[in-house]
């Protein structure tokens, strides 16, 4: 068996069945996951549930967006696990090429000060690079990094050190706790 190489559980396409079954609390797998993964999955499920409760047709119309968001933050293919019976061999991954993530987590906005945004950087990015602001309401806003500054206010061309605390100028308004990511 390939017990440590199973597909990831994903029920985004089955929100109606889960709600109709009386499920009113959803738990995502967050152990050993990045903040980007947890934020993306939680935001996407929240939007899917809200859309379904508002109008099932809206939920169906937005399905491509839900699938895209979930698939862009994971390392694995998906399965419905035991929800609809015993999983088949299709629920396992038998090759080693399972990496499907298409976004890199850059950091989270921790503070706004003098028109700049403080982050604790997680992966390298540079001035002039196009990144995305991932907002809680489901919007993804593409912006160009206008400036990067260390904590003393010195200008930098890039942020090369993981967990480096710095300030960035994105030329647009964003909120504390918005996430930053880069498409790969």
Residue positions per predicted region:
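Surface-exposed amphipathic alpha-helical tracts and adjacent flexible/coil segments at the periphery
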Residues: 1-184
